[in-house]
Amino acid sequence: MIKKLVSHLGEYKRAAILTPILSALEAIMDVLLPTIMAFIIDQGIEKGDMNAVVKYGLLTFLVAAIALLLGVLAGRFAATASTGFAGNLRDAMYENIQHFSFSNIDKYSTAGLVTRMTTDVTNLQNAFQMIERMCVRAPVHLVFALIMASMISRSLTMVFLVAIVFLVAVLAGIMVPTFGIFDKVFKNYDNLNASVQENVSAIRVVKSFVREHFENEKYTKACESLYKQFVHAESRLSFNNPAMLVSVYGCNIALSWFGAHYVLNGAITTGQLNALFGYIMNILMALMMLSMAFVMIAMSAASARRIVEVLDETTDLPPAKQPVQQIRDGGIEFEHVTFKYKHGSGQPVLNDVTFSIRPGETLGIIGGTGSAKSSLVQLIPRLYDAETGSVKVGGVDVKDYSLDVLRREVSMVLQKNVLFSGTILDNLRWGDENASEEECIRVAKLACADVFIERFPDKYNTWIEQGGSNVSGGQKQRLTIARALLRKPKVLILDDSTSAVDTATDAKIRKAFREEIPGTTKIIIAQRISSVQDADRILVLDNGQINGLGTHEELLKTNKIYQEVYNSQTQGGGDFDKQGGEQ
């Protein structure tokens, strides 16, 4: 795991290498100061030699200045390395996420991925900076301080060793169980982020149903769960400081008692005793720094594992060894296709589905909620892979195509319409970034979007808020249809993409499709029979299986479900789910 993370240092390796070197040199300078102070006392003050006081005083100033300079440089390089490291990690994670299939995203959830790229990376950045400085500086401090102290008095140095053993035992007892607690803490961060993301993105729905109180309670529960886990972890870590203070005071008392006897017996000088007190603080401060570093490591270990999980995740849509780079036509074939979601119930949502669509044909798909309409069409651009059987486009299995080529030629308007912050032109050019304004206007007319665009003061330069919050549902649907058309695809899939459009506009869009893009294979998923009755054929899905396939007239004669839906919609304005949906 560490090797995987360190490999993302990239151009910041130099700063990462210089930081511990400079920190080690800074620690050595610090360790020299108590010994120099001992010379000032023994050679200068006690002997009344002001020249010695000035000489060693200047040496103290010089060593302190060098230590300060080294510390500043180490801090600067540490900040550069840790910030750059975090940036590289986020870039690598983001790039890998871009290659995730829908199944990979289902595994982690959007909120979980956001937490890993923000909170987890920040934790690792802070830990890396602390490790770079403290986990090098503290051991060097500790080792050299022990060496200098033992040069003064080996027997008195045993006081330090007892304190070190005590602290290490206490810290180990605190840290080991804390690692598991922080795993739970960051899972609670995922839940908290999910609650915030869901609430903010759906704030209009929350307010329209007066559900603010319910959402506040849900958020409060997520906060309380995170709070309890964090308090549990911090309550264990709170033993660090008391253990440190016990060691400091114990060492001071022991050194005062035994040191006084050594001075009186002439075994050591007053200056050397003063130096030993300095080394006590050096050693215990080094241990304090190590304990702080261990706290950060405990917190970041869970974050590091979660980050590596994302970095190691590979798409479950393996690329073809020799990918086909061109799609012949928009013909589609499903051959005994069975499909289930990896992170779902484990039950197949499509069972042994077999049918074909001719190039340029318009196929309507109708079915109740949960009949797997969306699941079916998502296999065509290979958003998911079929469990068994094959899906072919242009006579070639979709698994044999380059994904870029396949998705460029199979344009899909998803059930959930998404617009991005930017102008209308910016959003349309998601279909083709090099499209001219004239081409954008043409597809907008095909999707009947030009009607409302022309009413805006800035027309095609009108700013769209994030998620398209400043346009209506029907306007959003028409813009996403226009965006898909801009790709000039061989296959166009509309996944219930005209549900918010009035029937007259829906009819105009279908007419434009027939007249302007007759060579494009069109698949239209809808709840309204009026949206699909003019299709060349209509597929009736029920519980993941084909219940009927034929023209509008044929299905009215032969398919019971289709008959019931048609009658309910023409007589009482019902929908598929009210009659013959999932019976």
Predicted regions and their residues:
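Helix-loop-helix
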Residues: 49-53, 144, 148-165, 232-306, ...
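Short intracellular "coupling" helices and adjacent cytoplasmic loop segments at the cytosolic face
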Residues: 47-48, 83, 91-115, 119-121, ...
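Transmembrane helix-loop-helix hairpins at lipid-water interfaces of multipass membrane proteins
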Residues: 10, 16-73, 77, 150-155, ...
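Juxtamembrane helix-loop junctions of ABC transporter transmembrane domains
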Residues: 21-22, 29-42, 63-110, 114, ...
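An intracellular "coupling" helix at the cytosolic face of ABC transporter transmembrane type-1 domains
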Residues: 11-14, 99-103, 119-132, 136, ...
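Alpha-helical transmembrane segments of multi-pass membrane proteins
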Residues: 14-16, 22, 63-82, 133-140, ...
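ABC-type nucleotide-binding domain
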Residues: 325-583
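Hydrophobic alpha-helical transmembrane segments of ABC transporter permease domains
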Residues: 21, 25, 29-33, 58, ...
